[in-house]
Amino acid sequence: MRYYITGTRRGLGAFITNLPELNTGANRIVDNLDDCDIFINCKHDGFSQVDLLYEDESKGKKVISIGSAASDWIHGHKDVYKYGIEKAALRNANDQLYYVGSDVTCINFGYFDSERSADVDYPKMSLQQCWDTIKWVIDNPNRVKEITVCV
């Protein structure tokens, strides 16, 4: 399988990119969306994950978007809720595309052990646990619309 992964400089994207199993044999990481079989839509940058989801889905490839359990926490007017709104938009776009037959999945993780959540004092999943969930979706013979995984 050929994988295209966004957000590879740090956190979950960097962890996935450096996995030996994705850099040997028939598995490899490619440098652009057109050359992949599986797109892991990992980099959060405003609403850009939504745009990338629509762009790749139109090419008929499997897309796994890394959402967030924060997409359930979208009420209020504080800046902190903007992240949840952006992830809710990703979740809703995934929902729409799934129901028209696209092979898209949104995985909504709770906190996981990364630079971004280093100061958060809540239980966190390991990056390996996150990868194990992603791998389960990849290996599943059925389409998986969405899954939320938290500690």
Set out the residue ranges of the language-model regions.
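Canonical Rossmann dinucleotide-binding motif of NAD(H)/NADP(H)-dependent dehydrogenases/reductases
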Residues: 1-28
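Structural signature of the Rossmann-like NAD(P)-dependent dehydrogenase/reductase core
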Residues: 5-6, 40-42, 62-68, 105-108
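Flexible cofactor-recognition loop at the NAD(P)H-binding site
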Residues: 10, 44-46, 69
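NAD(P)-cofactor binding segment of oxidoreductase domains
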Residues: 36-63
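Short-chain dehydrogenase/reductase
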Residues: 50-55, 91-97, 134
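Catalytic loop of short-chain dehydrogenase/reductase
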Residues: 59-100, 111-119
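Conserved Rossmann-fold SDR core element
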Residues: 99-112, 143-147
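C-terminal helical subdomain
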Residues: 119-151
